[in-house]
Design a protein with these regions (language model features):
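Interdomain coupling/hinge region of P-loop NTPase helicase/AAA+ cores
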Residues: 104, 123, 132, 143, ...
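Conserved nucleic-acid-binding Ia/Ib motif block in the N-terminal RecA-like helicase ATPase lobe
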Residues: 44-45, 99-166, 174-177, 221, ...
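Walker A/P-loop NTP-binding motif
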Residues: 63-72, 83-98, 119-123
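Conserved SAM-binding loop
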Residues: 36, 54-55, 105, 154, ...
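Conserved beta-strand position immediately N-terminal to the Walker
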Residues: 72-74, 103
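The conserved Walker
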Residues: 76-80
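Well-ordered alpha-helical segments embedded in enzymatic catalytic cores
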Residues: 58-61, 89, 160, 194-197, ...
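N-terminal intrinsically disordered, low-complexity tails of helicases
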Residues: 1-70, 108, 250-253, 262
């Protein structure tokens, strides 16, 4: 084009305008009380003593599938009761089978690992069940000593779990159930290779349970490798989209500051 000619866009700017869809809170209330659930009476008593009245949506919709031994993918936001959703049924199953080193829970952060173990202990109060928690920033030597004692549920962050396995202290092939909590964060934090290492080493794995706050297309390939014909549960507030974001056009005249206008 000749010098001095101004380039003009052929894109209609109105295409970028989008009105936000109002966020409507969807309240879910289970038709079942805690006492109605098909779980051990002692578990019910512990849940009621913790203040549980009814299961949350994710707990209500995943309970029977996990009890049946099916692989499961649950999409639900943090704070919806995901920890209880997997702990309640696996604890119920442990009551009848009761072998040590059967359940492996992998979480992205130390804080969540501690929280999961605390929840496990509160649900199993009065039971002869034990847990072990392995996270970074603690003594590896003490972790190795702890593994000499039985633990029905092992909880940990991927880095520490794989470290213990490579040192021969933790045998993944003993575990039959793998639980991946906050799967999206596990991937965001770069633990994909650690997860694949754990999965390949779990040669006797019978059930895989995966919970995530978001569902991304780039996760699907790995999810399909991890889960076999899974039950998929998406709760009412577990879908994250851009529909609630409003987009407008702000016209900036020649010589005007974009930042000044935006501010």
């Amino acid at each position: 084009r000749g010098r001095g000619q101004q380039l003009t866009s052929t894109i209609d700017p109105l295409l970028f305008v989008k009105k936000a869809v109002p966020i409507t809170e969807v309240r879910y209330e289970s038709a079942r009380m805690i006492n109605d659930l098909p779980i051990d009476e002692k578990i019910k008593a512990n849940l009621i003593s913790k203040g549980y009245i009814k299961p949350t949506e994710i707990q209500d919709k995943t309970l029977e599938s996990i009890l049946s031994g099916a692989d499961l993918m649950g999409i639900a936001q943090t704070g919806t009761g995901k920890t209880g959703a997997y702990l309640i049924p696996v604890i119920h199953k442990l009551i009848s089978t009761n072998p040590a080193f059967q359940i492996l829970v992998v979480v992205p952060t130390r804080e969540l690992a501690v929280q999961v173990e605390h929840e496990f202990k509160s649900i199993t109060k009065g039971f002869s069940m034990h847990s072990a928690c392995f996270i970074g920033g603690t003594s590896v030597r003490k972790d190795i000593e702890r593994l000499r004692m039985p633990a029905h549920v092992v909880i940990g962050t991927p880095g520490r779990l794989t470290d213990l396995a490579r040192q021969g202290a933790l045998n993944f092939s003993r575990f039959t159930t793998l639980i991946l909590d906050e799967f999206d964060r596990l991937l965001d934090m770069g633990f994909s290779k650690d997860i694949q290492f754990i999965v390949q080493a779990m040669r006797t794995r019978k059930q895989t349970i995966l919970f995530s706050a978001t569902e991304e297309k780039n996760q699907r390939k790995l999810i399909d490798k991890l889960l076999h014909r899974p039950v998929e549960v998406r709760v009412s507030n577990g879908k994250v989209t851009g529909d609630h974001i409003e987009q407008e056009i702000v016209r900036v005249g020649a010589g005007e500051s974009k930042m000044q206008i935006l501010l």
